[in-house]
Amino acid sequence: MKIINIGNKGQLSLEYILSSMIVILIISLISIPILLTAMDYSNDIIDSINSKSELSKITDAIDFCYASGKGSKRIVLVDFNRNVDIRLHNDGKRGFASINLNLSDDSKEITSYFDCNGLNEKIHLSKGFNRIAVKWDDDSNVIEVKRLI
């Protein structure tokens, strides 16, 4: 019968396993915080782009009613990822709608412009889908923007 002598070969493979685990641990400790930061920034970008797109739907509806004249009406369906307050202002020449977003690092104001200059309203929209009515009545001189329930 032949005796097989392993010697210290088992210890060598155990050292390789332990050293590779330490390297993987160090790499994960460095890469996970970087990955989480990148995910936060990408979520902020997605929220900003989505908010700008949804705000543009509302301002396009205001422009449509303004261009169509009295008696026009448009209903817009918007979808926001969070609760928002839309402020409709004007600077004397043209109007603008703005949303204040709280991002991961600071606050940012998203703005979209429209041609009508008589709106001064604030609309609260809840997270999810909301229906917005933009109408210009025949007997009114102001375009009305309100949330439909």
Region annotations inferred by a language model:
Residues 1-9:
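N-terminal leader/signal peptides at the extreme start of proteins
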Residues 9, 17-18, 22, 81, ...:
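A broadly tuned "polar low-complexity/structure-edge" signature
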Residues 16-17, 21-44:
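C-terminal juxtamembrane segment of a hydrophobic transmembrane alpha-helix
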Residues 33-149:
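N-terminal export/assembly leader peptides and their processing motifs that target proteins to secretory
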